[in-house]
From Swiss-Prot:
It is a multi-pass membrane protein. Expressed in platelets. The gene is Mas1. CDD domains: 7tmA_MrgprH (cd15110). GO terms for cellular component: cell surface; plasma membrane. It comes from Rattus norvegicus. This is Proto-oncogene Mas. The chain crosses the membrane at residues 36-60, 65-86, 104-127, 149-171, 185-205, 224-244, 263-283. Its main location: membrane. Interacts with AGTR1. Interacts with FLNA (via filamin repeat 21); increases PKA-mediated phosphorylation of FLNA. GO terms for molecular function: angiotensin receptor activity; G protein-coupled peptide receptor activity; G protein-coupled receptor activity; peptide binding.
Length: 324
């Protein structure tokens, strides 16, 4: 396998190792401060999402929205774990053996898998909430009871397919011209899927959601849920979306965009780590902030007053959604 087809971390590792081996007796180049910041933020985000996942799975009753949040938390955990290990690996500067190379590639591909899944899940959340506002009767009375779990399973499968294509055609391909053309085709496909399908769906549904909520006072009682959705999407578009742009450009223009790659990874780390903070601050009461239990805060943040009726009984919400 040609070394030039490594993922970004692997390529940086190879370049870094070769330069150090060529300059014996000199001091090692300093580790970019970006990696130190990533190594500081990612463990915090990993723990936050782990606590959130535990509450969602074992301490809280589920509704359609929390099923999506559960899967989003799993995607964030996988992303943060991989980027933390990759940053440590870069800092320790191990020799790039064949086995080590495959470990780096596996972590990098898993990182992309978590990133792609996060984009797809956020789009699904935005679209479903938009439908619940546009068609409230359908949402409350006719929505399939396992729709959230089914959609999440489909999106995980789509993310797996897209990530596998990116790995096979762009990361693990050779220098041959047909391999490069295949990679360009995959880049175009991912760009269309990300920027002409999912991102526009997210933006349009979010815009409709905001307009409808501003016009209807009946939505005020569940405004925290909508605030959670909107803030999460805005943070994703600001911090995480640039990474996908740079990753696609990276395959063709490493010399131009390679230096910006670490910054994009830092932004993606911030995005995945910020989600639990968003849920906490939106769900907490201003007068009782830091004095309420986390379960109460999360329940308030994820409360869905438009929850389908078949999920309610005797005035209490009954969990029927399952996490795949």
């Amino acid at each position: 396998m040609d070394q030039s087809n490594m993922t970004s971390f692997a390529e940086e590792k190879a370049m870094n190792t070769s330069s150090r081996n060529a300059s014996l007796g000199t001091s090692h180049p300093p580790i970019p401060i970006v990696h130190w910041v990533i190594m500081s933020i990612s463990p915090l985000g990993f723990v936050e999402n782990g606590i959130l996942l535990w509450f969602l799975c074992f301490r809280m009753r589920r509704n359609p929205f929390t099923v999506y949040i559960t899967h989003l938390s799993i995607a964030d955990i996988s992303l943060l774990f991989c980027i933390f290990i990759l940053s440590i690996d870069y800092a320790l500067d191990y020799e790039l053996s064949s086995g080590h190379y495959y470990t780096i590639v596996t972590l990098s591909v898993t990182f992309l898998f978590g990133y792609n899944t996060g984009l797809y899940l956020l789009t699904a959340i935005s679209v479903e909430r938009c439908l619940s506002v546009l068609y409230p009767i359908w949402y409350r009375c006719h929505r399939p009871k396992h729709q959230s779990a089914f959609v999440c399973a489909l999106l995980w499968a789509l993310s797996c397919l897209v990530t596998t294509m990116e790995y096979v055609m762009c990361i693990d391909s050779g220098e041959e011209s047909h391999s490069q053309s295949d990679c360009r085709a995959v880049i175009i496909f991912i760009a269309i899927l990300s920027f002409l399908v999912f991102t526009p769906l997210m933006l349009v549904s979010s815009t409709i959601l905001v307009v409808k909520i501003r016009k209807n006072t009946w939505a005020s009682h569940s405004s925290k849920l909508y605030i959670v959705i909107m803030v999460t999407i805005i943070i994703f578009l600001i911090f995480a979306m640039p990474m996908r742009v740079l990753y696609l450009l990276y395959y063709e223009y490493w010399s131009t965009f390679g230096n910006l790659h670490n910054i994009s990874l830092l932004f993606s780390t911030i995005n995945s780590s910020a989600n639990p903070f968003i849920y906490f601050f939106v769900g907490s009461s201003k007068k009782k902030r830091f004095r309420e239990s986390l379960k109460v805060v999360l329940t308030r943040a994820f409360k869905d007053e438009m929850q389908p009726r078949r999920q309610e009984g005797n005035g209490n919400t009954v969990s029927i959604e399952t996490v795949v």
